[in-house]
Amino acid sequence: MLYGAMTRPLLLLALAATALAPRAGAEPAPAPDPLAFVDPMIGTGPEGHTFPGATAPFGMVQLSPDTDATCRIRDCYAHAAGYSYHDPTIQGFSHTHFSGAGHSDLGDILVMPQVGDVKLDPGDPAAPGSGYRQPFSHESETASPGYYAVTLSGSGIRAELTAGTRVGIHRYSFPAGRDAHLLIDLRSSLYDYPGKILWSGLHMRPDGTLTGFRETRGWAPGRKLYFAMRFSAPLRGHAFIDRDEAIPYKGFQGPGRGSDALAEKLGKALEARMDFGPLAAPLEVRVALSGVDEAGAIANLDAEGADFDTVRTRTQAAWREALHAVEIEAPAPMRTNIYTALYHALLAPSVWSDADGRYRGPDDQVHVAKDFTFRSTFSLWDTFRAEHPLLTLIQPARTTSDIVNSLIASRRESPDGILPVWQFAGRETWTMIGYHAVPVIADAYLKGIGGFDADAALEAMVASATYAPYGGLGDYMRLGYVPIDREPEAASKTVEYAYDDWTIARMARAMGKADIAARFERRAGNWRNSFDAKSGWLRARLADGRFRTPFDPTAINYGSDYTEGNAWQYSWFVPQDQAALFALLGGDGKAIAKLDAMFDYDVSKLDYSHAEDIAGLIGQYIHGNEPSHHVAYLYVHAGAPWRTQARLRQIVESQYRPTPDGLSGNDDLGQMSAWLVFTALGFYPVTPGSNQYVIGRPFVERAVLNLPGGKRFTVETQGLSDANPYVGRVELNGAPLARTWIGDAEIRAGGTLRFVMQAMPNRDWGRARAARPYSRSTADE
């Protein structure tokens, strides 16, 4: 079945949202509240790596429970977001998390409420009471956009979380008559290892504001984070505790009641204990973050740190506005999948500048964002494909111009002078391959997004594409490919560089920079240098020109010829010129047969357990990782869109469910989710930079895109059901649409795209070459 069953809590929300549907003849009811159809628990199982906690759209703060932050880096994959649904205990509530990343860090400033004797260590999950971690039940959990709550069953404390852009607000209801305490553990960190905390500090200010910082050498070395924290109840006492036994403090004791009740403490293993005594009302803890300094955190707290209910109401309103960009009519489980996917797609790139515009850049210096908001958390190898095109389409232009301005500023401040590769907290991690900030900028420019210096952007793009020390680029510029005997993952790098080069050429041509355009148009064809005509695969070559042997198209190994994949996935990565690739494969028929072989491949005898990112397999199609994401749409390029329609159904049915285990792979900062949003609407950006969306098939009965500028673009379906999975015909604004793509400008202009569904394939629609989507070798440019 296409649509599964809803979880009970979400079903109740959905029923509540639609209970006021009008009777015949009554006035139309307002559109259902989209918050009722978002389930942040989706993807919190072992593969999705999403978090259930509270955050605002693109918020700096992601306030969420951590179920295990004690595991060491190589054992933590299921806990990349801090929370894993199948864990029985909560270790605490920390303020920073990635959504769906395949690697991790963060988990900053962990707070844990306690009663009675204060425990200073988390303890063993298998030994209740051995530390401050607490058991909990999912029946006591509530999660919705901007709000999370749970009861810690070991103590009876009710914990509630909400968040604004730069603040997180905790609300703890303690059992009556019990002494209330908070433990703040600056040692706790996701993907931890010995020595990760370089330095940290705690400072109790005269007005009762607790401030502090820590510097870590995790995924982003030298990352600094500052915080400010205020409490709604007066403190009876506090203690700053240094747990560093390896390097005990040898200096003189500062003033204070005892050795721990100090105004300030510095060290590598700090904790703070806040004591309140019995409380008659819930305790609110208001926390703001800054990447700049403690003064910045205090200013952010002053700017946004209202009471819990005010912040929750404000953030829920922001989520309603953001989610209202797409109105969905679909059966409840599908609607939940799509709205949750949209929610996940609106979490990053996250705000990194303070309320006053200051931010810490890639050079570890403080800068000021003038007339834009600096954003970070760029998982560009993943998100250039669909996440950024989705934001460009449904978010106000300011969001994308902020992103582009942040990329340009990062290049200007980078010690290497290039655009980000995988950046968070303003720091480069050098994770993954390509220079995929380039297609993000080009796609925005070509779609008419302004608000940034196009000349500076193009200069940054060219600088990134010609930086010889990076990823074999020196050899790529000299040989026309990356040689595998000099650089790992060379086949993947060659084809991805060629695509990025094509987007530079497109933008340069549109700007009238003919010399730059010609140079990168030549480079855009470099993928051909990796094509092995004898085998029909895109392969890695040696510096002397020979293809590397032995060769196994099914082999997946880190640091091999390909990046997180094999020849089956990467031999389709020529988004700028699929027609030329199909010609080399022997024509449309051969390409279709090879696509079918990919999906139908029997992988039962292959072992990919060593490759943690390889998940969501349908044959050799791997939906749980990004290189496959465009592949189902390639049948359209071969004149067989009906086969795309069948494959999309196969993927959507098997890879997305409204459950904690409902994502087949890492959400990767919104890319897995953006794929579903586009696909459910009936089209997908196979080639960002072409200004085209390839038409697939819809999974909604009706959808309305409320576009920036007040335009509305409607997707309508007739006859959509499990019995009618194929597109019979497509109409755009009432006229038959013979081509199998729709232009970005056509969507932005507003109108209606109508699908008539039927039981059997329409094998004629889209067969003609003139009807097919963009390919460089056949385009009239």
Role assignments for model-derived ranges:
Residues 500:
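ATP-dependent phospho-/nucleotidyl transfer catalytic cores
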Residues 9-19:
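Bacterial N-terminal signal peptides
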Residues 27-439, 445-495, 508-529, 535-538, ...:
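Accessory carbohydrate-recognition regions in carbohydrate-active enzymes
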Residues 17-30:
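Bacterial Sec-dependent signal peptides at the C-terminal "C-region" and cleavage site
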Residues 1-11:
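Bacterial N-terminal signal peptides that target proteins for export
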